[in-house]
């Protein structure tokens, strides 16, 4: 079966959505499917090569691609995905942008007028938010919609597939012992939407007001630079990220908008607890996330982890083990990818789920 994965941004952007498409392509190819990726050239970054990451998967980037496939999986972008596609195969709309589901996000993100939202979300984010209502009508033109299980109640369509993301748990695993220096990690874009300002405030409060002897580390920025007590790690390739997660004592995921952050799965699978913002998108059954509201809530959770590590080590390590076990049980590639294969076969053949 020929599967086309059609993405709204260049894979060179290398955000969470792009990473998901790369992993899905490799996993489907490993299941014997003939997979091609077609990307629009939005957000293209020079000097980033992705074809070497795809193995036998064909990758094409451009406008109005001629898509030849039995079924197409389209990361939905309002009023653009269909206009910029020429594909006759049955289509599955994939809801990966959190701004298409504003009810599941931090409502403070959407306060203010267009100028405020443009500043917080950027041009494409604001565009998606303002058109999310029209998107619900446009989705009728797709044979099916894919949404993550905890978000399906926010999606209106006659045929919704509730499938989680997945991870290669043999690759993402504990590879380092936790040393005695407590390390707190942020992984992601340094954007307001991602809550990087909250991480900075958390570091300032924890180190300053409470005097926690901890290192606060963040990917991105200029390597070696220290600002407000946060050490910048620069770009961290995936091979090194596995070790980074594993050696950290806590991962902070304070994003204000999300569908399902891969950071959560990567960290838990690597044996590290995750403190995440308490938004509907993070209320994930079966995953032992430590949910927190604002800086004060995250600070309380962090202090609890800090004290647990130094005063009740076995309880802390049990929390680490529980996180990995939950990912292996419900989100491993072996468990989840066959569900995607079944979805594509049903949509391509016109069968009911």
Regions found by a protein language model. Give the residues of each.
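Aromatic "clamp/platform" in nucleotide-sugar-dependent glycosyltransferases that forms part
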Residues: 256
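Membrane-proximal helix-turn-helix segments that form the acceptor-binding/catalytic region
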Residues: 99-101, 110-144, 152
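Acidic anion/phosphate-binding donor-loop and adjacent secondary structure
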Residues: 157, 164-181, 243
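Short alpha-helical donor nucleotide-sugar binding micro-motif in glycosyltransferases
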Residues: 235-236, 243-248
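A charged, aromatic-enriched C-terminal amphipathic alpha-helix characteristic of glycosyltransferases
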Residues: 311-345
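Conserved donor-binding/catalytic core segment of Leloir-type glycosyltransferases
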Residues: 176-194, 200-204
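Short hydrophobic beta-strand element within catalytic cores of glycosyltransferases
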Residues: 273-276
């Amino acid at each position: 079966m020929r599967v086309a994965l059609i993405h709204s941004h260049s894979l060179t952007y290398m955000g969470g959505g792009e990473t998901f498409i790369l992993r899905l392509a490799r996993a489907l190819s490993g299941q014997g499917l003939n997979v091609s990726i077609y990307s629009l050239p939005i957000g293209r970054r020079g000097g980033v090569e992705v074809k070497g990451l795809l193995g036998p998967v064909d990758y094409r980037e451009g406008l109005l691609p001629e898509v030849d496939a039995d079924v197409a999986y389209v990361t939905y972008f309002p009023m653009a995905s269909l206009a910029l596609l020429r594909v006759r195969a049955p289509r599955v709309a994939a809801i990966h942008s959190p701004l298409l589901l504003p009810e599941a996000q931090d409502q403070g993100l959407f306060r203010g007028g267009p100028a405020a939202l443009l500043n917080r979300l950027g041009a494409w984010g604001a565009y998606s938010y303002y058109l999310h209502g029209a998107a619900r009508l446009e989705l009728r033109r797709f044979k099916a919609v894919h949404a993550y299980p905890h978000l399906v109640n926010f999606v209106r369509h006659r045929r919704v597939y509730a499938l989680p993301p997945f991870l290669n748990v043999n690759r993402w695993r504990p590879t380092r012992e936790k040393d005695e220096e407590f390390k707190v990690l942020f992984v992601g874009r340094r954007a307001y939407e991602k809550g990087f300002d909250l991480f900075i405030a958390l570091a300032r409060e924890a180190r300053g007001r409470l005097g926690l002897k901890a290192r606060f580390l963040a990917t991105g920025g200029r390597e070696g630079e220290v600002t407000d007590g946060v050490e910048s790690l620069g770009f961290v390739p995936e091979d090194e990220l596995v070790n980074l997660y594993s050696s950290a004592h806590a991962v902070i995921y304070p994003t204000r908008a999300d569908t399902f952050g891969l950071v959560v799965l990567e960290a838990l699978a690597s044996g590290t607890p995750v403190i995440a913002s308490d938004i509907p998108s993070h209320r994930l059954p079966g995953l032992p996330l430590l949910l927190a509201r604002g800086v004060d809530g995250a600070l309380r959770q962090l202090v609890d982890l800090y004290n647990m590590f130094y005063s009740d080590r076995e309880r802390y390590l049990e929390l680490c083990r529980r996180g990995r076990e939950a990912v292996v049980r419900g989100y491993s590639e072996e468990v989840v990818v066959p569900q995607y294969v079944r979805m594509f076969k049903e949509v391509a053949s016109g069968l009911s789920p």
